[in-house]
Amino acid sequence: MMKLMLFSIIVILFSLIGSIHGADVPGNYPLDSSDDTYLCAPLGENPSCIQICRKHGVKYGYCYAFQCWCEYFGR
């Protein structure tokens, strides 16, 4: 019985840890007027990507795989 209780506590703790970290933030690559993605460098937080994302109505974005990625952006 004690093993079952310990196992249950461990499962609950791991599920809480998973919910704290959560899933990846949804988003999308914004497209320009030619339906192309915006290219960028350097990778990571990038001022030009943040500016592009704001132009598309999103507060934050960054450079991922040399293309601007906007968090919480849906086409």
Curated annotation (Swiss-Prot):
Tissue expression notes: Expressed by the venom gland.
Stretch forming the signal peptide: 1-22
Coiled coil start-end: none
InterPro entries: LCN-type_CS_alpha_beta_dom, Scorpion_toxin-like_sf, Scorpion_toxinL/defensin
Disulfide-linked positions: C40-C63, C49-C68, C53-C70
Keyword ATP-binding listed: no
SUPFAM superfamilies, alphabetized: Scorpion toxin-like
Cited Pfam families: Toxin_3
Subcellular location: Secreted
GO CC annotation terms, alphabetical: extracellular region
One MF term in the entry's GO annotations: toxin activity
Entry text on domains: Has the structural arrangement of an alpha-helix connected to antiparallel beta-sheets by disulfide bonds (CS-alpha/beta).
Family: Belongs to the long (3 C-C) scorpion toxin superfamily.
Functional summary from the UniProt entry: Probable neurotoxin that inhibits ion channels.
Name recorded for this polypeptide: Toxin-like peptide AaF1CA7
Species for this entry: Androctonus australis (Sahara scorpion)
Lineage, highest ranks first: Eukaryota, Metazoa, Ecdysozoa, Arthropoda, Chelicerata
